[in-house]
Amino acid sequence: MEDKEKQPKVDYGFTSCLYRMEIIREKKIRFLKITYGEDTFFCFSYLLEAQTAVTTDFPVYWYRRNLSSTTYRYHDNYLQETKEYYSSYYNLFHEKALKYIDFVEAGLNVQYYRRCISAIERELFFSPEDRTTKQRIETIGEIRADHKFQQYFTFKNLKFTPKGKFRVFLKLVKINCYRLAVIALDRLTKK
C-alpha cells in the first residue's frame, strides 16, 4: 500500500493459536471489547508474554465469511472501534515491545486504512434501513476527514479494492463528490 509519508514494511495476520491458560491468567490477557479484530489483539498480547511459540502449516482453523457474519454486519460504532483498535495495539507494543514499534506501526497504518474502507462499505451497503441519508453522508465525511486515513487514501491504493460500483464510489469519495453519490445510491436501492 502506498503511504504519502512513508512506506509500510509489513502486513500481518493470524489464523489460529493454542494457548496456555496459566499465562493468560497470570498476565491477565483479555480480549478487546470490540466486534472485529479482538482475536488478533489477544494473540499479540499472548505472544509478547510467551517464552516460546510453535508454528505449523497445518490448517487448524477455517474462517468462514458469509453475509450474516460479523465481518459484513453493520456496526454503528465501527469507526470508533477502529480508532480504539489502533490505539490499543500501538499502546501494547509501546509498553511491551518498543523495539518493534516502527515495524508494528507500519502494519497498523495499513490495517487502519483497510478498516476505514470497510467502514465506508458498511455505511453504504449494510447500514440499517432507518439510517438516514444525512447520517450516512456525515459518517463517510468523518472517515474521509481522518488524517491517518488520508495518508493512505490515494488513487494508487484504490486499485486494491474490488472492481465495481464500490470502487467507483470510493473514487467519488476521493474527489469529494460522495454526497451526491450517497443520495443517488439511496434512490436506486429504495426503488
Stretch-by-stretch model annotation:
Residues 51-54, 101, 151:
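Secondary-structure boundary/capping signal
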Residues 101-110:
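All-alpha amphipathic helical-bundle segments outside canonical DNA-binding/catalytic cores
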Residues 1-56, 61-79:
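Donor-binding/catalytic cores of nucleotide-activated saccharide
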